[in-house]
Amino acid sequence: MPAAPRRRLAFHAPFGPPDGATGNLQEVQDRFVDLSRYTAAGGLASRPDDRTVRVLVGRKGVGKTIYLRRFQASASDEDSVFAADREADPPATEDVLRVGQLFDNKTVTETWQLIWRRAIQRSAMSQLLCLPWLRDHLEPEVADRLRLDFTGLVPAARTPRPVYAEVSDILGGVHAAHRLSEHLKHRDWADLEYWLGKALRDAPPMYLYIDAVDDHFQRAPMYWLKCQKGLFLEIMRLLQSDLGRRLHVVVCVRDLVLSSVLRSEHGSRYRRSPHIRLLEWDIRSIGYFLAEKIRRLGAAFMLQPSKSGIEGWLGRTTIGNPARGVEEHVEDYLLRHTRLIPRDVVDLGNALCEQVAELKAEGARSMPDDRLRRVVGDVARGFADEQIRVCANQIASDQVPALGGRDGSADYFVGSHEYSDGCAEEVVALLEELGGDRFGRDAVERLADLGHERFGGHQHIVDVLWQNGRLGHDSMEPRAEHAHFYSPTGADSFHLPADKDSYVLHPCVPHRVRLRHVGRVPVRGYRRP
């Protein structure tokens, strides 16, 4: 009986579900494209039994949740360690905004680091005291000290408490900066850490897993960045502490967080850390991912089953580009319209498979140009719309007035669909004024000036577009036919480089914004292999 839902999933989503947070883990594992033997894959080649990983970094849709679920499942199968369930219920954005406005830029990251430290300690303590399997390992004196001596700092818990719940509890209990600082820096925390260390030495190694950052991050990116940066720094500090020998916390953070850390004065210590895994897909790894997804398709989704790869799937290897007067390889055409992430490839693959099934029923052996372009355009429009809305949310959250997190006015900027929708339409209108998908330095300066004017003094619309992968620049290498978009490890990653001759919009943007294609060379954010 359990096989029926799987057959329905296979028919409706031949490439699999796009969201790794949902679905049966075994199905996710079965559909996982393993890159552990792919030598050029970097963090993507991480094995599920690798216990050295502490931070998974990447954009939305790169697979952070799938990797974290695999790490957690592997650890939970090991009898000698305790692996908590994956946490997926972050604190409210309103709480994150409030902390960002209670403290200035010089102290907010340090404050977040302390919040995460106390929340992790409280969560670990609740696990040790509330789970009989762990509690039985503790000396009676240690258990009594933890349970009785710190009720002023840590409310009694009857069940194991997730880290996220402890963060929300800490933030919900105080509404003034000095009160929060007093709580976080109370002298009794040192005593609690001492007894917690003794408890952890007797108990099995403990692994905690913190996920679900993407959906909340995009509501107020710069505020969540500071929150996650504090989490990142605390995880790396914990790794070097005595507690970190027995307490292991594995987290997911956004690429912008790593970019911010690497730009700090201590960035070099993290650049090649074996405990940080950057899930950064390039054209080779995402091409391999696409090829594997095609290889696993059944004959029902292959227009020419006797052939392999793109040709077997869609019945063709090239497609005309009438706007530029060139022919493109189909694989190149498909991938350049994505953000080079698995989620986009899965979305696009499922949409194309639906058309393949219809064409097979009609007896066709290849997908016509116009049909292929229409499907790609429809899916790319969705990608562009999502990212434009993320840009609009970032602009809106940057406009939250001082103290907005305390007086409730922040909801107008980050909780109002009407306001964010208006910002998104304004971004579209600004992009339309560029006229084309390729333009010069003067057009970028004009875009920045118009953004400043229309968004009430907002200074950084070009940087917001750059950080979200919508705006890039053509390579200045001789005879190059590729563009550069944001990379978290780039030295200038937070700001659009101002010294380039030619700038471009991502290929999905013209499917959402009325723009003409400029030049014969299609925009692609990678160097073709």
What is each of the regions a protein language model found here?
Residues R98-F103, W224-K226, R263-Y270, L352-Q355, ...:
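Short secondary-structure boundary/capping segments
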Residues A21-A41, A176-A177, L297-T317, A443-R446:
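Flexible secondary-structure boundary motifs
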Residues W189-E327, V376-E386:
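The catalytic "switch" region of P-loop NTPases
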Residues G63, V213-M222, L256-S259, G435-R438, ...:
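Short acidic, S/G/P-rich loop/turn micro-motifs used as interaction or catalytic elements
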Residues M1-L102, H517, V521:
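Walker A/P-loop-proximal flanking segment of P-loop NTPase domains
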Residues R86-A88, G325-P529:
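C-terminal leucine-rich, beta-strand-based interaction scaffolds used for sensing/assembly
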Residues V53, G58-Y207, H216, F455-H460:
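P-loop NTPase nucleotide-binding core
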